[in-house]
Amino acid sequence: KLADMCRKIDAGHEKLKRMLPIWTPSCAEFANNHRAVKDATKPLQRLMLDFDEKGHSLEILERSLLLQKEGKWEILLVEESVRKGTHVLITLPEGVTPQEAQQRFSMDVGFQADPALKDVARCIYMVPEEYTLYVSDALFEVSPQSTQSSTEFFSCHSLPSPCHPERSEGSVSTAQPST
């Protein structure tokens, strides 16, 4: 059903996008299940970068994983967005602000991330599993060290289903993003 909705959105039925399920990549928990910055009780040391330029998901994936291999960034998730852009979820390095990380990662990967940074309460539309290009096992880990107060930061985790092993840590999907 999710894949069908995304195909219809891609075909021009934009109003369906608001019906997609969401997740918060930068926060694990909100007080009283109320998604607001002031109610973020478990923000995560993560930053979701949104690359709006279409058709570059595989190139962004390859460059991101190379940067990870070089020890420059920890990549948690790479997926094609509903509108065929690319989402890259990274671990925010200690002592680096989200703004600095966004700027540095954009320079390193060679594509400009959307300058509108997402706060801890901002959501991302879920996409079908076949849009997922890479998932690190670390995406599903939440440690006391990875959380801080909502006034310091923003982001959350949760995916709709387990991902394919070929899209997990240490491997690159050879499948083309959905068209």
Where are these regions (language model features)?
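Short Gly/Ser/Thr- and Asp/Glu-enriched loop/turn motifs at secondary-structure junctions
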Residues: 80-86, 118-123
